[in-house]
């Protein structure tokens, strides 16, 4: 069993640890955020649909060899150890041990892919893995904001369940400072469009992204975006906000700002105080707050 075209992207949310990882686009279409080291030096490109479908077929074949959902752990381990299955099977094994229910589409902005192409991918997913009940992906706010509402609805109808959007900050000043390539208005539009299409929405917020210099603006702007988007979420599927505390990765432009004295990292106490201020500013607007990353 050979899989010459098989690819897997470098990252996924912690909540997708046992998800089937399907790479539909390589790297990041923006790739300029000053805090992110992940795709630096890598060019973004879209994968051809036949390549993606071949990956799905290969993963389904590996799942059959491993015994499928509910297969014997002993037999699965033996197959992985004796080399009778290809490297793709290691990732498939995690998916199966998690119940074979969740899929994550990679890399940073699959929403930049044509909607009909994504629909074709999800159709093949459902054919090959009928136990799937959740398909999620990352998306850039600027991309989602430009998408037609009917395109987002077609993705939801085809099986896309949840959109992970990098809010980071709701302050235009902070967003410009970190070269995010999105505005607060685009974040609001993207969030509301996703919810109106029937998608679950997860926003990522980065405590400390404004540094000491712009902490107040960061809190105020982020609270405004959350207050504008959260009420649009249905009660049974509230907006989820996941925290990703700002860290300085070597080789990023943010490192240079810190070294030059233009950006001062918050300490732990200041970070906690900023988060408290954010929650106070959001008020009684309903949303779920989750802290599920080692950076926190």
Tell me the role of every PLM-derived stretch.
Residues 1-21:
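Short, charged low-complexity linear segments at domain edges
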Residues 14-75:
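Canonical Radical SAM [4Fe-4S] cluster-binding loop centered on the CxxxCxxC motif
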Residues 28, 36, 52, 105, ...:
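Conserved, mostly hydrophobic/aromatic
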Residues 44-47, 51, 113, 117, ...:
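Alpha-helix N-cap and loop-to-helix initiation/capping positions
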Residues 61-196, 284:
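Conserved SAM/AdoMet-binding glycine-rich loop
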Residues 162, 185-254, 268-292:
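Conserved C-terminal portion of the radical SAM core fold
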Residues 253-262:
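Short, glycine-/aromatic-enriched active-site segment of Class I SAM-dependent methyltransferases
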Residues 294-296:
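Conserved catalytic loop of SAM-dependent methyltransferase domains
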């Amino acid at each position: 069993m050979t899989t010459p075209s098989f690819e897997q992207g470098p990252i996924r949310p912690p909540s997708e640890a046992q998800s089937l990882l399907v790479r539909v686009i390589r790297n990041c279409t923006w790739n300029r955020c000053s805090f992110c080291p992940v795709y630096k030096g890598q060019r973004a490109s879209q994968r051809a649909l036949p390549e993606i479908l071949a990956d799905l077929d290969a993963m389904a074949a590996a799942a059959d060899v491993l015994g499928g959902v509910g297969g014997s752990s002993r037999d699965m381990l033996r197959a992985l150890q004796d080399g009778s299955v290809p490297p793709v099977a290691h990732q498939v094994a995690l998916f199966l041990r998690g119940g074979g229910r969740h899929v994550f589409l990679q890399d940073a902005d699959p929403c930049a892919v044509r909607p009909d192409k994504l629909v074709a991918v999800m159709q093949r997913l459902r054919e090959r893995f009928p136990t799937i009940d959740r398909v999620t992906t990352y998306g850039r706010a600027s991309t989602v904001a430009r998408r037609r509402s009917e395109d987002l609805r077609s993705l939801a109808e085809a099986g896309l369940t949840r959109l992970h959007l990098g809010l980071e900050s709701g302050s235009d000043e902070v967003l410009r400072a970190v070269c995010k390539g999105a505005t607060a208005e685009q974040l609001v539009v993207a969030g509301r469009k996703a919810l109106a299409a029937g998608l679950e929405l997860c926003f990522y917020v980065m405590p400390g992204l404004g540094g000491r210099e712009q902490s107040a603006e960061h809190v105020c702007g982020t609270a405004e975006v959350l207050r504008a988007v959260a009420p649009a979420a249905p009660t049974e599927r509230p907006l989820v906000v996941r925290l990703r505390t700002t860290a300085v990765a070597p080789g990023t432009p943010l490192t240079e700002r810190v070294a030059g004295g233009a950006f001062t990292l918050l300490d732990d106490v200041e970070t906690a105080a900023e988060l408290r201020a954010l929650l106070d500013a959001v008020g009684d607007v309903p949303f779920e707050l989750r802290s599920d990353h080692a950076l926190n």
